[in-house]
Every structure is written in C-alpha cells, then in structure tokens.
C-alpha cells in the first residue's frame, strides 16, 4: 500500500496539494508561456463548464484543481455539477450569459444532437464544437443480481431467453441508459441487438441519470444498465448486481466522452478556447499516469464533485476490476485512458460511427450529410494546434483510425458507413 493511501486519501490532503498547484498556476499565468508569450493572453479568463459525476470528467476537474486552467491564463473557470445529461443540454442552450454553461464534459453524440436541433427546445440548432475527446474505454453494462450465474458477458444468449420468458409472463423488462442517442444508449443497443434482442421491441429502454443508477437497481427498477464509473463498481461493492462486461470488451479503445463548447463562445474567444484546450490536454496527460491515480480519485470523489468513497473509483481507474460474479482482473487492457494512444484526439472517423448509429436507431435522419455535419462540429484542427503549442510530437497521422472491429465480428469502415449500416440485422424501422 502506498504512503498516500496509508496516510488516508482525504479531501483535505488533496486540497492542500491542489491549492499549491493552483498557486503556482496563478503565478505562471502572470507570465503565460507558449502561445500567449507575445500576445495579450486569452480574451477572457472566465468560462463555465459542466460535468456529470463520472470518472471520465476527471480532465476538466483536474485542470481546475491542479491549476492547469490558471497556468494558461484561464483563472476564473467554474466546473459545475449537472444533475443529468438533460440538464447539461438545457444549460448549454442557455449559455453562461443566460445562467447556463459554455461547455461541458459530454457524451460524444450530444454536440451533434444539439447542433442539429434534434434534442433542443423547439428543435432550434445550437451549434457546438467538439474540442477534444476526454477518454476511451471505461464504461460498463451491469446486470441485476437475479441474473447472476447465467454466464452473462458480451454473450447474452441466456439473458435473451430470460427476457423473453419475463415478457411472456407480462413483465416489463427495462434496460437503463443515460441519454437517448448518447454513448451509453448506443453501447446498450449494440450489445442487445448483437445478441438478437431488439432494444425497441423486446425490452423497454429507460433514461436514468448516472448517479441514480445504483439506487434504481436496488429497488428493482431495471434489469440492466449502461453507465460509466464509479457507479458499476459501487453496484458490485453493494452486492446489488454484477458487471457483465466493460465497454472496451465490446469495442477496444472506443471513444467515449468529449470536451465540447458552444461554437459562438469559441468563435468569440479563440485564444481562451485554445488556453482551455491546452489545460485539458495537460490534465489528461496527468490523469493517465498511474502514480497520479490515487490523487485523481481523491479529487473527483470529494464533496465538491462526486461525493463518493475513493474506494468506489480507485480500483477500476487502475485497471482492477471485480466483476461481481466471480470474475476479476488486476491489469485490465480495457482501462480508461485519457491520453495514451491518442485517446484525447477527437478522430472524425469515430464521430462518423456515432452518427451512423444514431441514424440506425432513428435519432438522426437517414439523409443527414455526414461529412458536412462532422466538419461543422469536430474541431480536431484546434486540438492539433493546441497540442503542437504544448510541444506534443506524437500526433495522429490522419483523421481516421481506420477500420474498427466489434466483439461480434462486425467491422466499421469509415470509408463506407452505408455498408456497415446495411450489415446490421436489427435497427429502427
């Protein structure tokens, strides 16, 4: 056990460390380096960002608590907890000028759903930019304890039979996700459909905010849910259910959350946006280092953020997974990554997959101009510019990661999304 753990991972200890970092960050911001060395600095030092209590929000929280925002001149960045993804959307629509937020830790498909007006009030488009990916991997599909012992993993054959039996007996079978068309919804739908379970006909897909998943499973509200950490680990620790699989087992190193902002804010404050992007990139590098995991978990687990025991976050953040059904691993290859292997780079080819799946399930129209839509929302060019200014030399060679392979053998070729869509047996009518 490390000395950090033996002394107690307390919010007070972490705040002392963070306060020191913030102090040095503030000093550094008085003499900003790199991009701001010969300029007047960011147009504004202020921005308001939102986050949901999920481990993959860590880069935004750490950027604030460890002084990375301040280091690049963004000395007044608020990182505010949102009650749900719906609340995140509502506050992005408002913008900080209207009492909302300028940007957020967000499910990657949401900036597209918001920019196209599919989920906004009156279907009015609110243009957004994806500035960075926040992580790959790290989500799970967990199942109620009643189904333990059936061998449910990515293979859900037994679950298909159990669900069919329950439905025949008049029971409503519910699977919970966090936002329609979001990543958790798409992982759940992909898994069910790959196992012959139609998510639109054979089960009821319900929306539950991430922090409420465990409480709802406890009172038998649903059979399964898809969400990020720490809620799957908490479910297992409380003995309420088990993790069927981590989403990296569904698609290795899959893209997950994004750091996105209102386009009008970025357009009005390009230097401030770059400063924040650099801070988030530096925070992602910090979060990815194993020696920082304990402090990272202590920071995000504190009462200003998640309000959960560090133990609910730490294990899986280090690749230690107790699935809750007898399986366990201590060095999972599907650990959440924030920076390694270009995890932070927002590959447009990945956004193309999300849009294709949103078309599959009816969240986006079949005639959507995919190339034009991605060009408007995905600002990988800004990511590259910020990374180069930071001195990053290992940049992605292109804007596509190439052909992606899923657990069921299906492949997605970004050069031919129509062929992928045609290969899928179950989809919205």
Regions picked out by a protein language model, each given a short descriptive name:
Residues 1-13, 27:
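N-terminal secretory signal peptides
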Residues 18-26:
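Sec-dependent signal peptide hydrophobic core
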Residues 32-37:
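Boundary at the C-terminal end of the N-terminal hydrophobic targeting segment
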Residues 141-142, 258-261, 265-266:
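Short glycine- and hydrophobic/aromatic-rich loop-to-beta-strand nucleating segment
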Residues 268-381:
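Secondary-structure end/capping motifs
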Residues 352-429:
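Conserved C-terminal helix/tail region of periplasmic/extracytoplasmic solute-binding proteins
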């Amino acid at each position: 056990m490390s000395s950090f753990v033996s002394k107690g991972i307390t919010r007070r200890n972490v705040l002392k460390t963070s306060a020191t970092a913030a102090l040095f960050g503030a000093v550094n911001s008085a003499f900003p380096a790199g991009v701001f060395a010969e300029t007047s600095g960011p147009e504004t030092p202020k921005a308001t960002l939102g986050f949901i209590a999920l481990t993959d929000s860590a880069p935004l929280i750490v950027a604030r608590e460890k002084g990375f925002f301040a280091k690049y001149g963004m000395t007044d960045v608020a990182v505010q907890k949102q009650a749900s993804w719906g609340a995140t959307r509502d506050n992005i629509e408002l913008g900080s000028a209207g009492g909302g937020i300028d940007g957020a830790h967000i499910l990657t498909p949401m900036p597209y759903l918001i920019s196209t007006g599919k989920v906004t009030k009156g279907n009015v488009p609110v243009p957004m930019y994806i500035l960075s990916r926040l992580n790959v991997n790290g989500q799970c599909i967990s199942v109620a304890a009643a189904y333990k012992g059936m061998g449910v993993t990515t293979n859900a054959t037994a679950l298909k039979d159990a669900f069919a039996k329950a439905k025949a007996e008049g029971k409503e079978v519910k699977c919970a996700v966090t936002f329609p068309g979001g990543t958790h919804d798409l992982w759940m739908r992909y898994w069910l459909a790959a196992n012959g379970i139609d998510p639109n006909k054979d089960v009821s897909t319900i929306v539950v905010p991430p922090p409420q998943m465990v409480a709802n499973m406890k009172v038998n509200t649903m059979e399964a849910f898809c969400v990020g950490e720490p809620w799957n680990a908490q479910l297992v620790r409380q003995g309420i259910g088990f993790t069927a699989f981590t989403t990296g087992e569904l698609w290795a190193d899959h893209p997950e959350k994004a750091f996105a902002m209102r386009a009008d804010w970025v357009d009005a404050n390009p230097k401030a946006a770059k400063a924040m992007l650099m801070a988030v990139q530096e925070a992602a590098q910090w979060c990815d280092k194993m020696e920082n995991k304990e402090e990272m978990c202590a920071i995000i687990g504190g009462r200003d953020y998640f309000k959960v025991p560090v133990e609910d976050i730490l294990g899986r953040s280090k690749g230690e997974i107790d699935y809750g059904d007898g399986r366990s691993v201590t060095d999972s290859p599907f650990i959440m990554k924030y920076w390694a292997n270009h995890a932070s780079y927002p590959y447009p080819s990945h956004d193309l997959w999300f849009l294709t799946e949103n078309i599959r399930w009816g969240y986006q129209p079949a005639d959507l101009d995919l190339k034009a839509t991605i060009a408007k929302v995905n600002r990988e060019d800004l990511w590259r510019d910020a990374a180069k200014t930071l001195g990053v030399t290992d940049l992605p060679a292109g804007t596509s990661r190439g052909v992606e392979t899923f657990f069921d053998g299906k492949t997605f070729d970004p050069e031919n999304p129509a062929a992928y869509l045609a290969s899928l047996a179950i989809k919205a009518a």
